[in-house]
Amino acid sequence: MDYSLKVYYKKEDLPHLDDVSFFHNTYTFDLYKNLPYYTPLMIVCFQNGEPVASLFAHIMRINRFLNTSIFKRCYVSQKPAYYKENLPEEDIFYKLMNTLMLELKHKVFYIEVRNLGDPIFGYKAFRDNSFFSIKWMNIKNSLQRKRNIWNQLSRSRKNQVNKAKRKGVYIEEVTKESELPTLYKLIDKNIHWKFSHRFPPYIYFENFFHSYIVNRKGKILITKYQDKIIGGMIIGLHNNEVAYSLYYWGKTKTYKNLYPTIYTIWYAMTYAEKHGYKFFDFMDAGYIHEKAGKPRFILQFGGKQHATRRWYKFSWNWINFIATKFYE
């Protein structure tokens, strides 16, 4: 079949695209509005003049003063959006990736594709474009089981949630824009440095409120104790199908015995269950062979782990060659 592909840098120029993907959608552009160091783009695949697939990516500049390609990275999250059934998805993805590589040539130093949820999806497209992979773990909770979320928790998790309840921990939703500055400063100050380094700037946070929370495509939950914020979570909501854990945090040192992170995650999962969502997706949770840390922590909420991959490519061939040899 003959396909034509086009790259778009502005939301206003896009054709009409159905809302079939949380990550590859027209409103995803709104997240990067007024962000000078981020450049969103979308590749749309057409068949007979009609869109059949799209792939969203964003370029991030890590240096505020230098604008050369060495300080730019490109990220893609999740499989592309497909707008028709029975499409040759792998073939279309191959064309999307080839177009992305041509578009990014000499523009970025590093490309990362993550949260695919399938270790073999796009394998040929990645290999032919000289990507290397690292095995990762995806964790997802089904909210359609006969056992509800509470009964999926481990015994220790149940005890921790009950203890937090007894001590007066509670959850509130962020519904006013005026609450955002204080909340953002709190997050940036208290979460782990490595996590904070990846946390987006405040304007992104503000854009999420206007584009997602106002339109019921997302929630910001804050966990409180004695009117003090001790944790929280940002979740993305897609068509009553999937709730995505985008970010979560908690003052686990100061309020260790109140289990703020555990209580927040439990509440968010319960919220998704009560509102008819089918899955709660933690996405890429850690390395496939990692037995402790984040993967073990999340698995105690009753989810299932699935093998997946993250794909990487450096624009400098010799670095890419060394990285490929090291990781594979």
Regions found by a protein language model. Name each.
Residues 2-65, 115-138, 146-254:
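A conserved beta-strand-loop-helix scaffold within acyl/acetyltransferase catalytic domains
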Residues 51, 82-87, 94-102, 208-317:
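Aromatic (often tryptophan-rich) hydrophobic motifs at membrane interfaces
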Residues 59-80:
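Conserved acyl-donor/pantetheine-binding loop and adjacent beta-alpha core of acyl/acetyltransferases
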Residues 73-78, 134-136, 293:
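Short, solvent-exposed loop/turn segments at the edges of secondary structure
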Residues 74-116, 120:
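A gly/proline- and charged-residue-enriched helix-loop-helix capping module
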Residues 124-125, 184-186, 292-295, 318-322:
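Short secondary-structure transition/capping segments
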Residues 142:
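Short His/Asp/Glu-rich catalytic/ion-coordination signatures at enzyme active sites or charged loops
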Residues 312-328:
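Membrane-proximal basic amphipathic "stem/tether" segments
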